[in-house]
Amino acid sequence: MKKYFSVVLFMSCVFMYAQETNFKSVCTKLAEHPNMTGNFTQVKTIKKINRNLNSSGTFIFSLDGIMWNTQKPFPSVLAVGMTSVIQTMPDGKQNVIDASSNRIFRSISGTLSSMFSGNAESLYSDFNIEFSSYGKTWNAVLTPKDSTIAAVLSSIAVSGESLSEVDKIIMTESGGDTITYNFTDKKYPKELTADEKAYFIAK
């Protein structure tokens, strides 16, 4: 019995170590492309009324933050940085929100920034992580440890068809609503253009 228990304990430890190593290896591969641009589709599912809200546009993931350039159904630009959230309307007017003291904004932006910079340790510090992979496809479900964040955001699921790509993100809110992003036509520029960098600068 003791021998059986020891074997089970050993295999559990090996499995846990393999999970950590695999997730770290994904972050390491993602860090090879610190900038990712492309097209996105977003589906927000409102659980209470069983309704889907669809939108689409272009996006930027970079160490500066995340930018959503929504083109349908209504044009708007939302840039989420580490210190501010900038919403730009079609007429050029901006609404700037200080995000330096907002844990939710910092968490969302910081999560992707940590993944694309290879900083898995930071993610393990802030989230409980369930990682699985099959061949080159992978999926990571991040559950926030911070109660303030968990009160709003239940989990962030990130997945890819290869170790160096993010193809889908599903954010589940505490009330059960979900926001699903699918990414296509992805490109990995070494540097952002001046126009792309300008999204993260308040005028």
Which ranges hold each PLM region?
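Sec-dependent N-terminal signal peptides
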Residues: Y4-V14
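One face of beta-strands
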Residues: P34-Q42, S55-F59, W68
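Short, surface-exposed coil-to-beta transition loops
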Residues: N54-S56, P73, G81, A150-S155, ...
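An acidic-aromatic
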Residues: T58-S107, I179
